[in-house]
Structures are given as structure tokens and as C-alpha cells.
Amino acid sequence: MLGFTNIDDKGQEGIELGWQDILAGKSGSRRVIKDRKGRIVEDIESILKSKPGKDIALSLDSKIQYRAYRELKLAMDTHKAKAGGIVVLDSQTGEVLALVNLPTYNPNNRTGRNGRKARNRVLTDIFEPGSTMKPFTVASALEAGKIKPDTEFNIAPGTITIGRRTIRDAHAVSIEEGLVTVEQVIQRSSNVGTVKISKLLPAQTMWETLNNSGFGASTGSGFPGEVKGMLHLPPWRPIRQATMSYGHGIAVNLLQLARAYTLFSEEGKLKPVSLLKIDTPPAGEQVISRKTALAVSKMLEMVVAKGGTAPLAQIEGYRVAGKTGTTHKVKAGGGYEKKKYVAS
């Protein structure tokens, strides 16, 4: 996150590079007379006044940052993951309270630093978000008036065919259990249900919801090397629209995804993110209606309740909302790895 400087104290990575001009200031110049030994004997005039560097205050909370690091390391050790990232946002202000990447390195000891450890994965790496994209498909359909939270879909037998491709839910669905509401589609994370919802939408409508939610564009964090992700413009083939509805064929960075989810806690408003402390929180832009945001937020609370995909995320005494997502890792030459995953 902080990055480092070179021997001349010029920022090379991270915050040090992104805010170099503010931190370093600018050198000045003056006209002088020197004696034959190079000593200044008379100051003639100032040509350019110097500007001292300024301090900046990061929005990071040291306690949250440490706990995020500790929990990420524990989760990676438990699940034997090769890499991971956590970002914590204040949804009311857009401030980044914690941003953690592993593996990492000690900037005070550069002997162990390499490209794999040095890059800020939260901002510079993209991944297919998988089922974490389903709430945005539902939000788009709610906004368009195509569905209501209690609209029912039949997802039995747990498969749906689009052209020559068959899309499956994680588990087979019996005829008796096949009729589910939109709320249950999100709660159970049904691919089939989400695809059926997406088929009610024009591609342009779905794209506009995703684009307005910040996907396919920079978050504006100012961090060097931040990627925009990938969001294809319509028109889409039916199979692309189907797979995008549950988070395949679209790529995001972790900060983009976290920022987009603040829509549901901020009654449909999207605010810019900031790595620096801000005095006056921005008003934000209304992306979806308050009614839609509250409806989806309720569905996300069902995800972490009994019957959802993440009941262990419940915290006694607190309202918790969330969404799980799992995708196969994309191969370098195309296609997907069979036994390598990205989990959100």
C-alpha cells in the first residue's frame, strides 16, 4: 500500500509514487555570486521559490488494518490459498479503512521483495466475481420493473440450456423444491434462477446497471497501476448475457466490487473511494432507487441467515449482509482451471 522510494527519496510504488508531487514539494532556485572556492558571498535574487512537501493523512485505521491482515493470513493458512486480499470501506464516506494483500513484503527490508509480493492485488489484479454479481442482475431487473422480490421462478432440475451450453446450479433441484422467489434465488445463489431473471432484461439495461455501479471503470482512488476491469459493451450473445448475470465473462478488481456493494447499504447511492482522510463526505450519485437498494439488502441478509450460503458470517447483535462467490481460475491461454478457484 505505502510503496517505497529510491535512493533519492523519489516514490517508486504505491502511495509514495501516487502522491510524490505533494509529499516531495518542489525545489527552488536563486541567483548568487560565489568566490573562487565556490562559496556563496552574495545572494542576488530568488528566481523560483521552493515549495516544501506536505503531509498526507491516510484513511486507514491501524486497528482494522491489523485485524484484516490477521484474519486474511489465518484464512489463507486454513484453506492453503496462494494469495488473498481484503478491503474495508466506510460506506458513508467512501474512505478505505483497511487494505491488505498477501503475500507481501517488509518495505524496510527489500531483500525478499519480488513482483508477486510487491503488487497490490486489491487494485491491480482482476478476477471473475462469480455469484457476487447476482445482486446487480436482480437490482437491474427490479429497477426495470420486470420482477418483484416475491416473483417466483422454477429452477428445477437445476439446469438451463442456452444454445449449445448448459448452465448448472451447484446442486440438483427436485421438482418439489423448484419453485423459488427472487429472494431465494439470491439466498441459495442459484445460477439458473439468475439466468432466468437476466433473460427478462435487454442487454443495454443490464450493461447500464453494471456500468453505473462502477464496473469497467477506475474507482478514482489515485493508486498507481489500478486496473479498470473488463465490461464488454452490448450487443451480447445470449450465452454471454446469461453467464455475465452470475459473474462470468466480466472482470473486476476487489476495490471495485467492495465499492459497488455500498450501493445496498447507502440506499442506492455510489460514492467515490478515497485512500486519504476526507473532512466532508461527498453526496454520491443515485444509481438505483432506495426501494431497490433496500430490497436487495434484505436478500443479502438472507444469504448469511439460516438457509443461505454463508450462515457462519452471522454476528450476534449485529445486522449482517453478504454474498458468496466462487469461480474457476482463468487459464493464461484461455479456458478455466479445473481444480483452482477464486473465492469471494
Tell what function each PLM region has.
Residues D9, L72-T93, N101, I126, ...:
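Flexible, solvent-exposed loop/hinge segments and secondary-structure transition points
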Residues M1-G53:
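Small/polar-residue-rich segments within soluble enzyme cores
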Residues D35-E45, L60, S91-S131, F136-S344:
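Beta-lactam-recognizing serine transpeptidase/beta-lactamase-like catalytic domain environment
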Residues V41-G84:
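Conserved, well-ordered alpha-helix/loop/beta-strand core segments that scaffold catalytic motifs
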Residues S27, H79-A83, N154:
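Short, small/polar residue-rich loop motifs at catalytic or cofactor-binding pockets
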Residues G25-R30, G84-G85, P238:
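Extracytoplasmic/periplasmic mature domains of Sec-exported, cell-envelope-associated bacterial proteins
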Residues L17, Y66, R70-K73, E208, ...:
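Solvent-exposed alpha-helical segments within well-ordered globular domains of core cellular machineries
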Residues T5, D55, T280-A283:
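Short, polar/charged loop or turn motifs at beta-strand boundaries
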